[in-house]
Amino acid sequence: MKKILFFALALVASVLAFTSCEKNEPELKGTVYHYRGISWADFEYEHDVYIALEDNHKMTMKWVGVKTSEDAEPVNLYLYDGIWEGNATEGYHIHCDALPQLPDGKPFDKWESFDIDGWCDATSCSFDYHINGSTMGIFDGEIVND
């Protein structure tokens, strides 16, 4: 009986140890956009707002502001005629000088957008973007604070 009890306790301890070693990565939600071979995404992570910009298969992520209201709509920042626009005017404080410049200096005037799901830790993020349940691609990169 003692052997069975010892075995059961060892099994429970090993299961608990295994589950406690799993990476605890907060999920994030946002939107990814595509235009002329350049992709970018906006997302929130622990009340901070980031933009991830991908050009030529290289990605940088940059902090651009903070969420100031729990009732705010999900962040949505996009470029139109070279100007950042979106619904992040209420419930967010976006630092305009922190918004990235376009790699080629051309304005985005048309885009495709997809919802994203993923995770972040203190230095990097990884998320996939999808439409109608089909994964369209993956962003994965370091957070760069300029």
Write out the residue ranges for each language-model feature.
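Bacterial Sec-dependent N-terminal signal peptides
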Residues: K3-L5, A10, S14-G37, G133-D146
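Short, hydrophobic/aromatic-rich segments at coil-to-beta transitions
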Residues: E25-R36, N56-M61, T89-D97, T123-S126
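Short, solvent-exposed loop/hinge segments that bridge or flank secondary-structure elements
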Residues: P26-K58, D104-D109
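Short, cysteine-centered beta-strand-loop-beta hairpins and adjacent loop/turn segments enriched
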Residues: W40-F43, V66-N76, Q101-F108, S134
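N-terminal glycine/threonine-rich, aromatic-flanked beta-hairpin/loop signature
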Residues: E44-E85
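Edge beta-strand at a domain terminus
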Residues: P74-H93, A122-D146
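An anionic, turn-rich surface loop/hairpin at beta-sheet edges
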Residues: G91-D117
